[in-house]
């Protein structure tokens, strides 16, 4: 996260750190057995760390899990920058609520442009160098009209199941290593960090976030055991 500060140790009990291959992502615990993240965070040898704050000084209640199952919008794992960048991970065993572990509810209402949104993660804190912090950083950005992202990224289709969020003058943004983490708008879990400008946090180049509300039926279907659930087109 660019332009943020160290998160309060108690404000992110749902935030998970995902390691895969040589990379890291974020993710969100949505109940004791399921994590929601970005499809592009899929990889080999995935590890999911829960109840984390400082990587160097671990919380006593931190837990480590591996995926038992992974679910994508369609079995072919077809996703693009602006479509279906979402993955549900079933943990190999449930986690109990504890001081630093608790799920985040799915949204009960759709996101509204103009909302203030919180981003968080262990991603780089420099837009031009890979400077990964020991603790997660948090920042507040704004939910912008989709057309702002279309102006910045002409390859975006006329409509998509993504949210556009950032600060028009730049300076605050999610960045490399934050992918898969949550976008929390007006207290509701509305987005998943997907992609954005390179370098991060440039003026008029907001980030693109998978719209969680649009995928609720799929998320709830998969969790309920309906593996035929499909994502919206």
Curated annotation (Swiss-Prot):
<dbReference type="InterPro" id="IPR009003">
    <property type="entry name" value="Peptidase_S1_PA"/>
</dbReference>
<dbReference type="GO" id="GO:0008217">
    <property type="term" value="P:regulation of blood pressure"/>
</dbReference>
<dbReference type="InterPro" id="IPR043504">
    <property type="entry name" value="Peptidase_S1_PA_chymotrypsin"/>
</dbReference>
<dbReference type="GO" id="GO:0044470">
    <property type="term" value="P:venom-mediated suppression of blood coagulation"/>
</dbReference>
<dbReference type="GO" id="GO:0005576">
    <property type="term" value="C:extracellular region"/>
</dbReference>
<feature type="disulfide bond">
    <location>
        <begin position="117"/>
        <end position="185"/>
    </location>
</feature>
<dbReference type="GO" id="GO:0044485">
    <property type="term" value="P:venom-mediated fibrinogenolysis in another organism"/>
</dbReference>
<comment type="function">
    <text>Thrombin-like snake venom serine protease that clots rabbit fibrinogen. Only the beta chain of fibrinogen (FGB) is cleaved, releasing fibrinopeptide B. Human and bovine fibrinogen are unaffected. Also cleaves Met-Lys and Arg-Ser bonds in heat-denatured bovine plasma kininogen to release Lys-bradykinin.</text>
</comment>
<feature type="active site" description="Charge relay system">
    <location>
        <position position="40"/>
    </location>
</feature>
<keyword id="KW-1199">Hemostasis impairing toxin</keyword>
<dbReference type="GO" id="GO:0006508">
    <property type="term" value="P:proteolysis"/>
</dbReference>
<keyword id="KW-0800">Toxin</keyword>
<feature type="domain" description="Peptidase S1">
    <location>
        <begin position="1"/>
        <end position="224"/>
    </location>
</feature>
<dbReference type="InterPro" id="IPR001254">
    <property type="entry name" value="Trypsin_dom"/>
</dbReference>
<keyword id="KW-0645">Protease</keyword>
<dbReference type="GO" id="GO:0030141">
    <property type="term" value="C:secretory granule"/>
</dbReference>
<feature type="glycosylation site" description="N-linked (GlcNAc...) asparagine">
    <location>
        <position position="78"/>
    </location>
</feature>
<feature type="active site" description="Charge relay system">
    <location>
        <position position="179"/>
    </location>
</feature>
<keyword id="KW-0378">Hydrolase</keyword>
<keyword id="KW-0382">Hypotensive agent</keyword>
<feature type="disulfide bond">
    <location>
        <begin position="175"/>
        <end position="200"/>
    </location>
</feature>
<protein>
    <recommendedName>
        <fullName>Thrombin-like enzyme elegaxobin-2</fullName>
        <ecNumber>3.4.21.-</ecNumber>
    </recommendedName>
</protein>
<feature type="disulfide bond">
    <location>
        <begin position="7"/>
        <end position="138"/>
    </location>
</feature>
<keyword id="KW-0325">Glycoprotein</keyword>
<comment type="subunit">
    <text>Monomer.</text>
</comment>
<dbReference type="InterPro" id="IPR018114">
    <property type="entry name" value="TRYPSIN_HIS"/>
</dbReference>
<feature type="disulfide bond">
    <location>
        <begin position="25"/>
        <end position="41"/>
    </location>
</feature>
<keyword id="KW-1015">Disulfide bond</keyword>
<comment type="similarity">
    <text>Belongs to the peptidase S1 family. Snake venom subfamily.</text>
</comment>
<feature type="disulfide bond">
    <location>
        <begin position="73"/>
        <end position="231"/>
    </location>
</feature>
<keyword id="KW-0964">Secreted</keyword>
<keyword id="KW-1204">Blood coagulation cascade activating toxin</keyword>
<dbReference type="Pfam" id="PF00089">
    <property type="entry name" value="Trypsin"/>
</dbReference>
<dbReference type="InterPro" id="IPR001314">
    <property type="entry name" value="Peptidase_S1A"/>
</dbReference>
<dbReference type="InterPro" id="IPR033116">
    <property type="entry name" value="TRYPSIN_SER"/>
</dbReference>
<feature type="active site" description="Charge relay system">
    <location>
        <position position="85"/>
    </location>
</feature>
<dbReference type="GO" id="GO:0090729">
    <property type="term" value="F:toxin activity"/>
</dbReference>
<dbReference type="GO" id="GO:0004252">
    <property type="term" value="F:serine-type endopeptidase activity"/>
</dbReference>
<feature type="disulfide bond">
    <location>
        <begin position="149"/>
        <end position="164"/>
    </location>
</feature>
<keyword id="KW-0720">Serine protease</keyword>
